[in-house]
């Protein structure tokens, strides 16, 4: 009986320690809680012309001025970093599925969080805030649909 009681106490203590020490620092929820910003949850289009994050009508994704990605043709593409031409005024943020503004950064939400940073107000740098793994860019942003 004492062994069973001791085992039960150890099990409960272990569960308490595990739940208290759990690190969720990489979760979307924590990222959004850390940022003060403006939220929008509207349409699925970001940007204008040839520079955009996601256009639901064509499924073209993340078209960069440096030519790393020209369009999305259904194949997995591991690239996540690049530059998007344009300035803040060129992008209609009211049409972004989910976003937050913080300084010169835009955090785009959806399936996973992406961080977009303005550089000299004429380029956008896309920064991956999660580990890439083997996910395609399409898999990472299709949560906008």
Spans of features found by a protein language model:
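Residue-level recognition of alpha-helix boundary/capping or hinge positions
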Residues: 4-8, 12, 19-21, 48, ...
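Bacterial Sec-dependent N-terminal signal peptides
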Residues: 5, 13-38, 42, 143-145
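Short hydrophobic/aromatic-rich beta-strand segments that constitute the beta-sheet cores
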Residues: 41, 69-74, 106-109, 122-128
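N-terminal glycine/threonine-rich, aromatic-flanked beta-hairpin/loop signature
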Residues: 51-107
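Edge beta-strand at a domain terminus
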Residues: 81-96, 127-145
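Short, exposed beta-strand-loop hairpins at the edges of beta-sheets
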Residues: 113-117, 121-134
